[in-house]
């Protein structure tokens, strides 16, 4: 990247970005671990794109993202480790082609290096989660069932392995019979 990126440290709260265009960095936005009962960041009508690392890296904090695009990251477009998150009307799309891509559109975990990070909530409403891979969601759930891992997808288009449960409602799974790659057709 040509510069680092935006970082919100542990003691930083009530940050609000509207109409931001963040691109060309080593990462996009990084939010350090903090209390999940207080809002760390609200991101609205913004773009995070073409970064060499993670686009939006959130660790055990509370963040709301609306009407935004996070795309083309060398690692993950969005990386969630524990916390409380809501994404509404967002596009997470990883078609990164400037180097070897090491991630997916969405990574969700509740444990790292044997340390628990409860995922109290990760809600995705009316979102597109896509990319050039066959599975653009990577989940890392702890073997310890007592560590919260709560997610919900509603009215989304998802490029991932189809899954059915009560946490996935009215989702369209990206398949050959649902969509056509226009680059291959004239």
Regions found by a protein language model. Give the residues of each.
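Beta-strand/loop edge motif enriched in small/polar residues
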Residues: 1-186
């Amino acid at each position: 990247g040509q510069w680092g990126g935006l970082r919100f440290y542990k003691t930083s709260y009530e940050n609000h970005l509207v109409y931001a265009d963040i691109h060309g960095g080593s990462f996009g936005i990084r939010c350090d671990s903090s209390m999940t009962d207080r809002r760390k960041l609200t991101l609205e009508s913004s773009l995070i794109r073409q970064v060499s690392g993670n686009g939006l890296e959130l660790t055990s904090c509370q963040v709301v993202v609306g009407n935004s695009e996070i795309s083309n990251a060398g690692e993950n477009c969005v990386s969630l480790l524990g916390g409380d998150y809501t994404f509404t009307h967002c596009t997470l799309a990883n078609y990164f082609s400037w180097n070897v891509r090491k991630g997916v559109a969405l990574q969700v975990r509740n444990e790292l290096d044997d340390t628990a990070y409860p995922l109290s909530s990760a809600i995705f409403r009316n979102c597109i989660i896509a990319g050039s891979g066959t599975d653009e969601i990577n989940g890392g759930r702890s073997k310890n069932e007592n560590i919260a891992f709560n997610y919900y997808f509603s009215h989304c288009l998802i490029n991932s392995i189809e899954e059915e449960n009560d946490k996935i409602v009215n989702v369209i799974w990206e398949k050959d019979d649902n969509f056509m790659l226009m680059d291959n057709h004239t």
